[in-house]
């Protein structure tokens, strides 16, 4: 299986030579949110300009940016002497009146590319991504900093189509040695107004709607159950008070009856002695 850097390089190929290449969007493996409102991440032209033979001397790659138009595909980035243009973001109104140089970076030989096996290492991830990718529009302060020097890689405009071109420059001579084609139009994202965002739950799944309905009605049922429990407790308290009063009345009515029985018993007991005296008296008469 070929190394991953080779696959990335092949992703930029169109016909097989540097002149017939086009800059391509970075793979979603390395740039998930791409393009954004103001930036576009591109794959660097790795192993393209030096694919046939090693280059001698020091070389840099210039990245030019141009707003898409009817003539942008044939726009030139060099003068009649093969000297690369030095137009800036401000001079071209952000690429609307002509191409501007946004980024310049050293051409890394294929043999010196960092291994992608260490992409999982947090301390090395940024270095590896910088070696394989370039982000257009990444500098948000260069336009307003009066002390800024160098290329101003200013933010791009939202909802705008751009074209990009890589140019190989020999730093010893300062001349263009090779270049790619202009890329296909790449459109930056558009900011979605909040008023147009559809928050209606009708776009949710049926299961989500059922769960939302149940959770929404659950507090109501809990409140009804709580109120019912309070009402039942009050009814039970009233019933227990009525039974206590009834028992006390029965007890009070039962007391006189018991007393009456005692009186009758007492009376019967008191009648006992006279009977005994009569028996004694009759016995005396018999004697």
UniProtKB/Swiss-Prot annotation:
Region span, Disordered: 242-287
Residues exposed to the Lumenal side: 19-207
Tissue specificity statement from the Swiss-Prot or TrEMBL entry: Expressed in ureter.
Annotated S-S bridges: none
GO CC, alphabetical: apical plasma membrane urothelial plaque; endoplasmic reticulum membrane; extracellular exosome; plasma membrane
Keyword Glycoprotein: yes
Signal sequence interval, chain numbering: 1-18
Cytoplasmic side: 236-287
Any single GO BP term: kidney development
Membrane topology: Single-pass type I membrane protein
TM annotation in the entry: 208-235
Positions annotated as glycosylated: 74, 139, 170
Keywords, ordered alphabetically: Disease variant, Endoplasmic reticulum, Glycoprotein, Membrane, Signal, Transmembrane, Transmembrane helix
Places the protein is found: Endoplasmic reticulum membrane
UniProt feature, compositional bias: Polar residues: 261-270
Described purpose of this protein according to its UniProt entry: Component of the asymmetric unit membrane (AUM); a highly specialized biomembrane elaborated by terminally differentiated urothelial cells. May play an important role in AUM-cytoskeleton interaction in terminally differentiated urothelial cells. It also contributes to the formation of urothelial glycocalyx which may play an important role in preventing bacterial adherence.
Family statement drawn from the similarity comment of this UniProt entry: Belongs to the uroplakin-3 family.
Subunit record text: Heterodimer with uroplakin-1B (UPK1B).
Disease implicated: Mutations in UPK3A have been detected in patients with renal adyplasia suggesting a possible involvement of this gene in kidney and urinary tract anomalies.
Protein's name in the database: Uroplakin-3a
Gene assigned in the entry: UPK3A
């Amino acid at each position: 299986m070929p190394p991953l850097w080779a696959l990335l390089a092949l992703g930029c190929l169109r016909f097989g030579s540097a002149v017939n290449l086009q800059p391509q969007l970075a793979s979603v493996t390395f740039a998930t949110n791409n393009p954004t409102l103001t930036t576009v991440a591109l794959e660097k032209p790795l192993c393209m300009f030096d694919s046939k033979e090693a280059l001698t001397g020091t070389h840099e790659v210039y990245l030019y940016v141009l707003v898409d138009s009817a003539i942008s595909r044939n726009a030139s980035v060099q003068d009649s002497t093969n000297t690369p243009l030095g137009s800036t973001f401000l001079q071209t109104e952000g690429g609307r009146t002509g191409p501007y140089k946004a980024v310049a970076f050293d051409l890394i030989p294929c043999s010196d590319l960092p291994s992608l096996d260490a992409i999982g290492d947090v301390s090395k991830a940024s270095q590896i991504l910088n070696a394989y990718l370039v982000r257009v529009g990444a500098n948000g302060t260069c336009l307003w900093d009066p002390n800024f020097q160098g290329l101003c890689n200013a933010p791009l405009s939202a909802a705008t189509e751009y074209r990009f071109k890589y140019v190989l420059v020999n730093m010893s001579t300062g001349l263009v040695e090779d270049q790619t084609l202009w890329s296909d139009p790449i459109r930056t994202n558009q900011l979605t107004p909040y008023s147009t965002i559809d928050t209606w739950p009708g776009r949710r799944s049926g299961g989500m709607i059922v769960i939302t309905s149940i959770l929404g009605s659950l507090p109501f049922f809990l409140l009804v159950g709580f109120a019912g429990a309070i009402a039942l407790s009050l009814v039970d308290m009233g019933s227990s008070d009525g039974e206590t009063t009834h028992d006390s009345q029965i007890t009070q009515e039962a007391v006189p009856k018991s007393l009456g029985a005692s009186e009758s018993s007492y009376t019967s007991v008191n009648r006992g002695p006279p009977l005994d005296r009569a028996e004694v008296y009759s016995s005396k008469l018999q004697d």
